[in-house]
Amino acid sequence: MKKTFITALACILVAGCGSKSTVDPSLWAPAPIPIQTPWAEEVSPANAHPEYPRPQMVREKWASLNGLWNYAVTAVDAEKPAAWDGQILVPFCIESSLSGVGRRVSAEEALWYHTTFKVPSSWRKQRVMLNFDAVDWAAEVYVNDQLVGHHTGGYTAFSFDVTPYLKKRGDQKLELRVVDGTNNGEQPCGKQVTNPNGIWYTPVTGIWQSVWIEPVRSAAVTSYLAVPDVDASSVDVTVFADGAAEGDEVEIWLREGGVGYNPEKPEGAATVAFAAVAPGKPVRLTVAEPKLWSPESPFLYELEIRLKQGKKVVDEVRGYTALRKSSEVVDSEGHKRMGLNNEPYFQYGPLDQGWWPDGLYTAPTDEALKFDLVKTKEFGYNMIRKHIKIEPARWYYWCDVLGIVVWQDMPSIGGTHGGRWEMWKWASPEDDRELTETAKGTYYKEWGEIIAQLRNEPCIVAWVPFNEAWSQFNTEKAVEFTRSCDPTRLINSASGGNSFPVGDIFDSHNYPNPAMKFTSEGLQIDVLGEYGGIGWPVEGHLWQTDKNWGYIEYKSGEDVLKQYTVYAGQLKDIIAQGVSAAVYTQTTDVEGEVNGLMTYDRKIVKMDVERLRAVNQDVIASMKK
């Protein structure tokens, strides 16, 4: 009998247990911090992010390596340590409370990790892939004292085939050496700085997303690309495979259930399209009665992919896709608008930085990760600008499932935040920064990898190569590069940065009130990429006792809501003049910033939710189509 997807997921979660060597959980406790989220108390070495980490490409068999590892901090040029400093809870970065360590690592130091794991006997005669979902920043990976490979970049997943390095049986030794320059001017790091203050936050070093292993045969699917074409009611799918031979074939099913793809209730999914094609060859799957994805109706189609050699299935993965189009459209009054599925669609949502008091870059649990998104929907928004950070795959999965459109920023290169910045005029080439050749190369490498990793996510509707003028260089070339990586989404060349007539979107920032002091005058889609920042430091829920700030500050939720409502009225005025989207700062307080819709610990929502929702829905409805 064919397994339903929910049954397969249950098997996957069971299979993910038990391969990590056992440790004494009494050796771990969270490092002290001023505040923590409600989910921090649920975290333990036995349950550190146990959920399947890659919902876009699910295999039945896998094993999590999250849990307690040994760690040591040495001089950057030191050999592997002879003894370990203590234990660290993976996947939480060493600076975080939930790591159990809570210490900084400088650019003159190296962070070493050590653990052991067992390969299940049922995986014999298969290759074993070792997967790191994110390590900040430069990593060297060793298995059984042999160098397996290197990786640089703090935001993308990487994998190694470790089969040649494994012993035939028993414990396998895994070690990792990490060096992180943070804001040294050579690498993307977003809001991380070595000296946190104001809008700059605690640095993140080392492993900060899940580590896991999975078995694959000599021929296996490595990735796929699913490109929706709403106008043709179809999805173009290309499946890539490693080790495939001439004559091998991939079979692709596109399925829908009664309410679309839902891993909680996948029973009854019906095939709406099928194709068989050689690996690496694109094929079009046409849907007779298409259902489009939107925040109001986030309909997802299930993808099932099988790699076959003759009649034998050698690999099978499952994922999902959606029929969704992001484009420029013109409304009835001649204004260029952001379009969703060929209709003008006002996009309104918070600036979301994705920081946590207890995990820093890493949410304490998957439920916590989902919580911010559920609240965003409850508040009446339909969009999030993901601000100079890349999230774990499950964050985008929840946006896809819940129905939230996302603008995805590229994390800025640290140490490059000064220089010329004149937002309210057209810029010239001399306004672009001069970065080192190393920094430029790193930017293009990491941005290209980020886009490739996230291209299949229906929720993402716009790429943002630069924020303000931070590390903004050769804007025209950066936009061309972004377009070459993905021609199907809108490009916001520099949100609130130096403006060039390239890309699709002209983006201005104004604090605290919503205003457009300069527009593209019809050349591009005009949006307000940041405004607001209404602050309220809620006693008992603060990261620090002083030096907290917002762009303006109040002492009660009622006062915050009154000011927010005033700004909403002003926002409607500029929407009528052609503004097509707006981003409010911000989802939560972050460290010393107290301008969140919620406190940093997520325990207090600062405004009455029903009234906030009504205001936001009124703003969205005000744009004429």
Q: What name fits each language-model region?
A:
Residues 15-16:
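C-terminal motif of bacterial Sec signal peptides marking the signal peptidase cleavage site
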Residues 23-131, 188-200, 204-207, 217, ...:
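Extended carbohydrate-recognition surfaces in non-catalytic/accessory domains of CAZymes
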Residues 29-31, 196-205, 210, 218-225, ...:
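Low-complexity, Pro/Ser/Thr- and charge-rich linker/hinge segments at domain boundaries
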Residues 72-74, 103-104, 108-221, 244, ...:
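Accessory beta-strand-rich segments of carbohydrate-active enzymes
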Residues 167-171, 240-331:
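Extended acidic/polar, glycine-enriched regions
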Residues 215-245, 332-337, 619-625:
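Surface beta-strand/loop "capping" patches
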Residues 224-226, 304-376, 617-618, 622-623:
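N-terminal carbohydrate-binding accessory modules
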Residues 373-375, 383-616:
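Substrate-binding/catalytic cleft of secreted carbohydrate-active enzymes
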